[in-house]
A protein has these predicted regions:
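Hydrophobic membrane-targeting segments
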Residues: 1-81, 100, 108-111, 134, ...
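Polar/charged, Q/E/K-enriched amphipathic alpha-helical segments with strong coiled-coil propensity
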Residues: 42-46, 71-87, 97, 101-170
C-alpha cells in the first residue's frame, strides 16, 4: 500500500479510473457472451420448437375435427348430410396424414422421431377403422347404426385415445 500512498493524486485517480474501466470491459464482455448464448437459444426455439408445436397443434385439431365428423355421421339420418360428412371425413383423414408428413422435417432427436413414428402408426390404425364404421353408420333406420356406434365407441375410440396421448407428448 505504500506504493499507492506515494503516488500523486492525479496518478491515483488515473489508476482507479483504469481499474473501473477494466472491470466495465470485463462485465461488457461477459454480458455480450451471455446475450449471444441467449440469442442462439431464441433462434433455436423460433426455428425448430415453435414450428413443431404449431404442427403438433394442427395434428391435434385435425384429429379432433375428424372424430367430431365421425360422430355427426353416426347420428345423422339425412342422406345428403351423410355425403357431406363423408367428404369432410375424407378431407380430415387426408389432412391428418399430410400433417404428419409436414412434421417430419421438424423432428429434433431420436426420442422425438420414435414418438412421431408411434403417433403416425396410431393415426393409421385409427383412420383404418372408418371404412367399416362408415358402411354401418350410413344405414339409415337399420341395426347398422348400433353396430357402428359400438365400433366407434370401442376399437376406434381406443385408437383415437392412443393417438391423442401421443399427440399430447409431441
Amino acid at each position: 500500500m505504500s506504493i499507492f500512498n506515494n503516488l500523486k493524486l492525479g496518478h491515483r485517480l488515473a489508476l482507479g479510473f483504469g481499474l473501473v474501466m477494466s472491470l466495465m470491459a470485463a462485465l461488457t464482455l461477459a454480458a455480450y457472451v451471455g446475450l449471444s448464448d441467449t440469442n442462439d437459444d431464441l433462434h433455436s426455439i423460433a426455428d425448430n420448437t415453435v414450428p413443431s408445436l404449431q404442427v403438433a397443434a394442427d395434428l391435434k385439431s385435425t384429429s379432433l375435427n375428424l372424430r367430431r365428423f365421425e360422430y355427426n355421421h353416426l347420428v345423422s339420418e339425412d342422406p345428403s348430410r351423410l355425403l357431406v360428412l363423408e367428404a369432410d371425413i375424407a378431407k380430415q383423414q387426408a389432412d391428418l396424414l399430410q400433417t404428419f408428413k409436414a412434421y417430419e422435417p421438424l423432428i429434433s432427436g431420436d426420442e422425438d422421431r420414435a414418438l412421431w413414428q408411434e403417433a403416425q402408426a396410431d393415426a393409421l390404425r385409427y383412420v383404418s377403422q372408418w371404412g367399416a364404421i362408415q358402411a354401418l353408420s350410413g344405414q339409415i333406420g337399420g341395426a347398422g347404426k348400433s353396430v357402428a356406434e359400438e365400433r366407434l365407441t370401442g376399437p376406434s375410440r381406443e385408437y383415437f385415445e392412443q393417438l391423442q396421448a401421443k399427440l399430447d407428448k409431441l
